[in-house]
Regions:
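Feature of Fe-S/electron-transfer and energy-metabolism proteins
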Residues: 1-369
Length: 369
């Protein structure tokens, strides 16, 4: 707020308190008591190492986990595709380039629950046969980078990362790559190009990264929340995990509510939760007159208030409505703000952030602006 600039400079202005809480019947992602210590990490790793890899894949597929970064592709199927590639060198990549305005779920997990994310990477590497992983973390998240590096160092010290993990003969290590500030790097092929030191441009698919990804080798790319959810599945069991949700979309989802809510913050909810419940009961209603919500980032779609009354938080409902769930960031558009001006802003954003490779985006975003 420009009117409070003097207060901010003087350090007298305080931002509204943000809440982190789970509203799920089976909390995991924001619940430290379930899985948060290095002993938890070791114990669950030992259980997984004693289980056949095909059984682990079957459990992951049975859980119904789908990518939490936007596309919603079945995670178990992605890992299985990569595992089946008969190539000696494979990679695991964590997409932590959280660039959607209003989204901070990935940042929360990396700074408050890093072991859940790192466990997902280690067990993915074990299943697909990878020896090297990369965490591509948004450059604007210095604390996330520091905490992740500290956690990696501790895992190496405890023998939970590096050579011969837990005496199993399994070797795996990972490194942090600092993002370069481009929104397009949130797209998996552009992210891969950035890790390789190339210009961050999207690649034509197929081949998909699970067949030909980083350095032209089979690669699993998952976002932060997807990897953290893997730890939940192997900790709670696939039956318990898939019992959460509405039968179509399973498990829990982190949502980010902005400052137009009376209770702004980050919350864990069951997929299938009515948006009206999120607004009224979790968010405490709005503190201003709102005309619409931008959910899932600048490309996720604008949801009018009247549609919110019947919409549920799940992949199918959003797809049927022509929206994209994405990171499930809730950005409010007040009635006092012109919808035309907001649309212009979105086109300007996409025109600025487009990598320029594909002409519909390169030309369309500029014309829209």
């Amino acid at each position: 707020d420009i009117n409070k600039l003097d207060q901010i400079i003087a350090g007298k202005h305080t931002s509204p308190a943000y809440t982190m809480k789970s509203f799920s019947n089976t909390p995991f992602l924001v619940e430290e008591s379930v899985f948060s210590t290095y002993d938890d990490f070791k114990d669950l790793l030992e259980v997984c190492f004693a289980t056949d890899k095909d059984d682990l894949i079957a459990s992951l597929k049975d859980s119904g986990l789908r990518g939490r970064g936007g596309a919603g592709f079945p995670t178990g199927m992605k890992w299985e595709f990569c595992k089946d590639q008969e190539v000696s060198t494979k990679y695991v990549v964590c997409n932590a380039d959280e660039g959607d305005p209003g989204a901070f779920s990935d940042r929360y997990l990396m700074e408050e629950q890093p072991l859940k994310v790192l466990f997902g990477m280690v067990i993915c590497a074990y299943i697909i046969g990878s020896k090297q992983g990369f965490l591509y973390i948004r450059g604007e998240y210095p604390e996330s980078i520091t905490i992740t590096n500290d956690s990696l160092a501790k895992l190496r010290e405890l023998g939970l990362l590096g050579d011969n993990i837990l005496g199993t003969g399994f070797d795996f290590d990972m490194n942090v790559v600092e993002g370069q500030g481009a929104y397009i790097c949130g797209e998996e092929t552009a992210l891969i190009a950035s890790i390789e030191g190339r210009r961050a441009e999207v690649d034509v698919r197929p081949p998909f990264p699970v067949v030909e990804g980083l350095y032209k080798k089979p690669t699993v790319v998952n976002n932060v929340e997807s990897l953290a959810a893997v730890a939940a599945i192997f900790k709670l069991g696939s039956e318990a995990y898939k019992s959460i949700g509405n039968g179509r979309s399973l498990g829990t989802k982190l949502i980010s509510l902005d400052g137009y809510f009376n209770n702004p913050g980050l919350y864990e909810v069951d997929l299938g939760t009515p948006i009206s419940f999120i607004i009224d009961e979790i968010g405490g209603g709005f503190n201003d007159d709102i005309k619409a919500l931008q959910i899932g980032g600048p490309l996720g779609g604008i949801v009018p208030v009247d549609i919110l009354k019947t919409l549920t938080l799940d992949f199918e409902a959003f797809s049927e409505g022509g929206f994209l769930l994405g990171h499930a960031s809730f950005v409010c558009i007040p009635k006092s703000f012109s919808a035309v001006e907001y649309a212009k802003h979105l086109f300007a954003f996409t025109a600025h952030e487009s990598c320029g490779k594909c002409f519909p985006c390169r030309l369309g975003s500029v014309r829209g602006k």
